[in-house]
Amino acid sequence: YKSTPAFGFDRLVATLVSNEYELDGVPGFYTKKNNTYGINFNKKTTGILIPICSITDKIEGFQIRLDKAFDDRKYIWFSSSNHFRGTSVGGPAHFIGNPLSKTVYVTEGALKANIAHVLSGKTFIAVPGVSHYKSLESIFTQLKQTGTTDIVEAYDMDKYTNIHVEKACMNMICLANNFGFNVHRLKWNDKYKGIDDWLYSMNNK
């Protein structure tokens, strides 16, 4: 992963432009008053860039894991929707693993999915937030075409104590059922909140 810059934004944009990269319509970039490009980085957005990848391994956007959370948020999108001629990232789901896998796990958060994939070798989809189950529709459509048969719900263990997370789980399960997948629910020792934490503990026994 790469860190976001804390300064040198104009120089970074100038380098991209001089290398003839097209920045129109790219989330995170916008047009400034002097008709040059700007990039939506600032001192509050310092952190780690986490690529959000499609089932074909193309980057569709970035999340930033913030060094210092603000407004109770640890993650934000690299987006420029609130700037002139800026673009929203749209909140896509993240995919990592083999697109031909018969079984695919669904969790929340790209970084968590990446860690779980490395620790288990399994294929994962990550929604950007538990309530964003509709972001799965495109990937589910593609997985159905490539032969996936089973979806495993692997949301955090607070799904058993948080009614909002449980509702989000059920929405995802209903969506997977509508696509004709066999759906399973994964449960582990609840002292480990996320599947990444649980897999890490299992790998270190």
For each feature predicted by the language model, list its residue ranges.
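Generic structural signal of hydrophobic/aromatic residues within well-ordered alpha-helices
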Residues: 8, 12-16, 195, 205
